[in-house]
Curated annotation (Swiss-Prot):
This is DNA-directed RNA polymerase subunit alpha. The keyword Nucleotidyltransferase applies. The N-terminal domain is essential for RNAP assembly and basal transcription, whereas the C-terminal domain is involved in interaction with transcriptional regulators and with upstream promoter elements. DNA-dependent RNA polymerase catalyzes the transcription of DNA into RNA using the four ribonucleoside triphosphates as substrates. It comes from Afipia carboxidovorans (strain ATCC 49405 / DSM 1227 / KCTC 32145 / OM5). Keywords: DNA-directed RNA polymerase, Nucleotidyltransferase, Transcription, Transferase. The lineage of its organism: Bacteria, Pseudomonadati, Pseudomonadota, Alphaproteobacteria, Hyphomicrobiales. It is an enzyme of class 2 (transferase). GO terms for biological process: DNA-templated transcription. Gene3D superfamilies: 5' to 3' exonuclease, C-terminal subdomain, DNA-directed RNA polymerase, insert domain, RNA polymerase, RBP11-like subunit. Homodimer. The RNAP catalytic core consists of 2 alpha, 1 beta, 1 beta' and 1 omega subunit. When a sigma factor is associated with the core the holoenzyme is formed, which can initiate transcription. SMART domains: RPOLD.
Length: 339
């Protein structure tokens, strides 16, 4: 037995379906199927942990407010105390292209609400939630705040954001660098051909807009791939590539696909099997009337088969010159990557 059989004979997902949410830059549902039994839970849990903890992002690390010495202060003419303002600052979502740290400033006079959209940013820093309210100024009040922004991963507590040489009045802020806000997953049964006990993994991802859910998942998978490489203690033998000569066919290569590979109901599949219909080429030559004469084959099964064939650009009652070929089994193997 070759070692490659350990992974080559496992079924792998043949598609990743992405369904965008109301805001495609922030919300999406991603479905991978089919997976070997148990792999849905294994991959779902691992990807969720990496998505929430390991992706790079940007966040506010500290703030300096003019006239404020510490976070337990209050500011004349500002309705919120400094503690509440700092809590609001934690929720600022930022996208930063270059390397940090960077400085951002707010300077505003009352009356009115101070929002994240009032921040004066540098060129490669973007505030993603400008509607976020930071504080409220009364008539005649004024506030000036200077933020330090940097990149990182995961969650960093405020005490770790305080430099050793921090000046008086610098207030460190808890930093949530991760661009991913929420991740949930579920595992369901799915079918492949006539086998019903494969896994379907569904991931629902919400980001802050700095990265799309699809890219976040791709980066997380790459992180896992990189971390697992250390456990592979062998090199695979290189397979010599031989250029195969593919013969010309007088018919569509899709006709060489077996009907048991179609996603049909058990009833429809059994009816085809009992009527000795093995390949799609056998099936498309049948008329609707011939199919309805098959024992236990009704209108519901007929409509199901017509729908599956239509998705392939085929239909019942087709003429297939040269069918069946003498070497049909050999041709089916040679053309399995062409339909």
């Amino acid at each position: 037995m070759t070692i490659q059989k350990n992974w080559q004979e496992l079924i792998r997902p043949n598609k990743l379906q992405v369904t965008p949410g109301s805001d495609p830059s922030r919300f999406a549902t991603l479905v991978a199927e089919p997976l070997e039994r148990g792999f849905g839970q294994t991959l779902g849990n691992a990807l969720r942990r990496v998505l929430l903890s390991s992706l790079q992002g940007a966040a506010v690390q500290s703030v300096h407010i003019d006239g404020v010495l510490h976070e337990f202060s209050s500011i004349a003419g500002v309705r919120e105390d400094v503690t509440d303002i700092v809590l609001n600052i934690k929720d600022i979502s930022i996208k930063m292209q270059g390397e940090g740290p960077k400085r951002m400033v707010i300077k505003k006079q009352g009356p009115g609400v101070v929002t994240a959209g009032d921040i004066q940013t540098v060129g490669d820093v973007v505030v993603l939630n400008p509607e976020l309210q930071l504080c409220t100024l009364d008539d005649g009040a004024e506030i000036r705040m200077e933020f330090t922004v940097d990149t990182g991963k995961g969650y960093v507590a405020a005490d770790r954001n305080r430099p050793e040489d921090a000046p008086i009045g610098l207030i460190p802020v808890d930093s949530l660098f991760s661009p991913v806000r929420k991740v949930s997953y579920k595992v369901e049964n799915t079918r492949e051909g006539q086998i019903l006990d494969y896994d379907k993994l569904t991931l629902t991802i919400e980001t802050n807009g700095a990265i799309t859910p699809e890219d976040a998942l791709a980066y997380s998978a790459r992180i896992l791939q990189d971390q697992l490489n250390v456990f592979v203690n062998f090199e695979e033998p290189r397979k010599e590539v031989v250029q195969e000569i593919i013969p010309d066919l007088a018919f569509n290569p899709a006709f060489l696909k077996k009907v048991d590979e179609l996603e049909l109901s058990v009833r429809s599949a059994n009816c085809l099997k009992n009527d000795n219909i093995v390949y799609i080429g056998d099936l498309v030559q049948k008329s609707e009337a011939e199919m309805l004469r098959t024992p236990n084959f009704g209108r519901k099964s007929l409509n199901e088969i017509k729908e599956v064939l239509a998705q392939m650009g085929l239909h019942l009652g087709m003429e297939v010159p040269g069918w069946p070929p003498e070497n049909i089994d050999e041709l089916a193997k040679r053309f399995e990557d062409h339909y």
